[in-house]
């Protein structure tokens, strides 16, 4: 029997894409993955996540990711984009005939639940799924590792903007400095984030 976990990384970031990942794992491998330390990616160091990423890839039947760009995030509802990405992942992993899909609950996930039921699988959509279910933890690690690598690439091009989150003073200062120098923001900034009204008002755009 196979289960699928789905989770995202970078949802609240001011800079860079959101990555949604899904992974298909045989049920009898979940205990092993839990025993070697697969858990919510936020509880792990980057080095540990990267080591576990390799093991997860080796022990899974397959995984897939969807990258949601800042431009998409600025033009559509973030929850709706997340649901679309989740459904896309579910359909890409349906070939493994999973019996259960474990997903971290974000907003009203009814549309995702309906798709899972339509495909004849059990929806397991709960708050903090990445904490309680190994398959969701594995997906959170995949999403985080891939996003970290994307962020590294962006930093090599645009400079060190810190974590990319609006709570990070380094990120805020980077945006302020870019704002002073460039009339047009680099495409890595999510222009609909309200913090821009304070630190870079001409960069800010309203979604609707």
From Swiss-Prot:
Record field: catalytic activity: Endonucleolytic cleavage to 5'-phosphomonoester
Any single Gene Ontology cellular-component annotation: ribonuclease H2 complex
CDD domains named in the record: RNase_HII_archaea_like
Biological process (GO), any one: DNA replication, removal of RNA primer
Compartments, as annotated in UniProt: Cytoplasm
EC number(s) stated in the UniProt entry for this protein: 3.1.26.4
PROSITE patterns reported in the protein's UniProt record: RNASE_H_2 (PS51975)
Cofactor: how bound: Manganese or magnesium. Binds 1 divalent metal ion per monomer in the absence of substrate. May bind a second metal ion after substrate binding.
InterPro entries: RNase_H2_suA, RNase_HII/HIII, RNase_HII/HIII_dom, RNase_HII_arc, RNase_HII_hlx-loop-hlx_cap_dom, RNaseH-like_sf, RNaseH_sf
Main location: cytoplasm
Cofactor: Mn(2+); Mg(2+)
One function term, GO molecular function aspect: manganese ion binding
Chain positions recorded as a divalent metal cation binding sites: 7-8, 104
Keywords attached to this entry: Cytoplasm, Endonuclease, Hydrolase, Manganese, Metal-binding, Nuclease
Domain RNase H type-2: 1-205
HAMAP family xref list: RNase_HII_A (MF_00052_A)
Function: Endonuclease that specifically degrades the RNA of RNA-DNA hybrids.
PANTHER family, per the entry: RIBONUCLEASE, RIBONUCLEASE H2 SUBUNIT A
NCBIfam families linked: ribonuclease HII
Name of the protein in question: Ribonuclease HII
Species for this entry: Sulfurisphaera tokodaii (strain DSM 16993 / JCM 10545 / NBRC 100140 / 7) (Sulfolobus tokodaii)
Organism taxonomic ancestry: Archaea, Thermoproteota, Thermoprotei, Sulfolobales, Sulfolobaceae
